[in-house]
């Protein structure tokens, strides 16, 4: 039998027990974020702990809960975590919400006017055929989601209001912007465009949604029903 060795301890260390150069901030600066554990990354965001718990112990406790559980918890419930005060509970909720918005690749951009809608939409259409796109916005005019609702031939695109409203209900959207392109010709509304917009507006009102605008795009230009006073 060899000489007895000191017991190796894999338990989680408190921040003050870690050499300064290996603490989360210093480690991030020297080695990059990919070399930090989840607890260390959260510790960098939280910045400091409290009298009851240092930042690494606090981060470990939060990570152990899991992201889905943190998403469900209210600020009041988070305050029950030992060492987590109001400011840090709000930081955690803000971080979880930000992560949720970026998840899936569709960041929550804001679309507050026809120009911003045009900038978002201008590269979403197939120039060879007419398509109808719907944007779904929340109360703060942030984009919840968007989809191609219908595809037609060179000159026409057909859809029914229910094709647009089904997803609005699913997303609990507040406002809807629709847009279609004119592959050939001016970005001005036809009688069919006007009639469809009126039908959709009435359907939106019945279900408590707001039809914010209808844009027609063609050759780098756009026509906004809202801007022109048609809607």
Swiss-Prot record:
CDD domains from the xrefs? Answer: MPN_DUF2466
- For this chain the motif JAMM motif maps to 180-193
**For Zn(2+), which residues are the binding ones?**
180, 182, 193
GO annotation (BP), single: proteolysis
Q: Name one GO molecular function term.
A: metallopeptidase activity
Sorted UniProt keywords: Hydrolase, Metal-binding, Metalloprotease, Protease, Zinc
The family database entries (Gene3D superfamilies) matched by this protein are listed as: Cytidine Deaminase, domain 2 (3.40.140.10)
Q: Where is the MPN domain?
A: 110-231
Known InterPro entries for this protein? MPN, RadC_JAB, UPF0758, UPF0758_CS, UPF0758_N
Family per similarity comment: Belongs to the UPF0758 family.
Q: Which PANTHER family match?
A: DNA REPAIR PROTEIN RADC (PTHR30471), UPF0758 PROTEIN YEES-RELATED (PTHR30471:SF3)
This protein is called UPF0758 protein aq_1610
